[in-house]
Amino acid sequence: MAIEESPTYAEPGPYEALSRFSSLTREDHRKWWEHTGPVLEKVLKDSGYELQSQYTYLYFVQQHLVPYLGTFPTRGEDEHRWQSNLTPYKVPYELSWNISNKVVRISWDPVCDASGTEADAFNKKAIHDCTRQIAQLSNTIVLDRYRILHQELVISDQEEQELLRRDDLPKSGRGQHNLAVDFQNGGIALKVYFYPYMKFLATGSPVEQLFFAAIEKIGTADIQEPVKMLRCFLSPSFDDGKPSVDQKVFPSLLACDLCDPSKSRIKYYVIDKWVKWERIASLWTIGGRRLEDPSCAKGLALLKELWDLLAIPEGDRGDIWPNLVLGQPPTHLMTTMANYTLSPASRFPEPQVYLTTFGMNDMAIMDALTAFYERAGLTDMAKSYKKNVQSYYPNLDLSQTNWVHEAISFSYRNSKPYLSVYYSPF
């Protein structure tokens, strides 16, 4: 009697397994999951995450992030979705990859059905529900600083009504916050970011003043020295006898970790409209104030290597946030960004510089990054980077695109470069 062999089948990966009995019933949510899930699975795998962690983080995205992404972007229908501040194409989702530590991060702008409508013209509601939901998943997430910064930097209901009566209110750029989560050590680390422009329009208070007032509300007893140094660098009215920035540099974001306040870092972001190496060096050294920090010169030398390899054209970027249309390649370049970490761990504001590559050829960027990885001793990443990134965009010819690599961030910590790459979701 012949014995029938059991049929063999391939074990499904985490994305496929989680999709089989997905609870996502809305079409937009399913589209978001189908678009983001496979790429996230690949990046997690390429970063060396164990299979259990891949399941954990994909499930987190499916259940707690996708439902807050709103209408799925469709070419030619930009006006039908929330115009997010998060990405150049105003899409509320961004994946980034910490190359040095192989940590995956997702940033998103929580959106609900009311976002952008008369019921919630400035998208103030969704983030509350989203943060509360995520905070219930881990006792390491603490929302104290979120509440303080939201109170200080997000427009009130009265200010909202006053803004809506103005004839000069821009249609885009109304968002005031976004979230980010790091997938690390089997858990999640949550961060919040605040955009100040609407609060500035509503109150007339300079953004710099809004930011430092908010920092004071949080409490600065243990970070007075780095706060004072940063304030002197960013404002000529706080003179310490050393150079301060000009009008091309201005504050753009204030962020913090949503964890135990004693461990939470504050991050102060600036934009420089004039892209030039000497100005990037000034951002890094804080106008020369940080030169006595032993790590400053070492980090600056590596940053210069990265700058030279990327070959970003210098120039004045007049339009800091161009009116891009999804599906149309960018035709010009964007600004430099930097953030400064304010923490009791250092008397200096710790800089992180963002070299914005959006608008540059993606293959050229991958070649430059591969060369830098080799110089930095990241040999495995140097060997696999181009092949991996091409697999994340199977329908694109990266020798012809100029929007996939949005930016490269660089800092120098624990005597080694700390590099992250930010990718376009489309």
Curated annotation (Swiss-Prot):
Substrate binds at E94, Y195. It catalyses: 6-hydroxydeoxybrevianamide E + dimethylallyl diphosphate = notoamide S + diphosphate. It is an enzyme of class 2 (transferase). The keyword RNA-binding does not apply. Keywords: Alkaloid metabolism, Prenyltransferase, Transferase. One of its GO terms (molecular function) is prenyltransferase activity. The keyword Plastid does not apply. Its EC number is 2.5.1.-. Dimethylallyl diphosphate binds at R105, K191, Y193, K267, Y269, Q352, Y354, Y418, Y422. Signal peptide: none annotated. Pathway: Alkaloid biosynthesis. Coiled coil: none annotated. GO terms for biological process: alkaloid metabolic process. Belongs to the tryptophan dimethylallyltransferase family. Prenyltransferase; part of the gene cluster that mediates the biosynthesis of notoamide, a fungal indole alkaloid that belongs to a family of natural products containing a characteristic bicyclo[2.2.2]diazaoctane core. The first step of notoamide biosynthesis involves coupling of L-proline and L-tryptophan by the bimodular NRPS notE', to produce cyclo-L-tryptophan-L-proline called brevianamide F. This is 6-Hydroxy-7-prenyldeoxybrevianamide E synthase notC'. It comes from Aspergillus versicolor. The lineage of its organism: Eukaryota, Fungi, Dikarya, Ascomycota, Pezizomycotina.
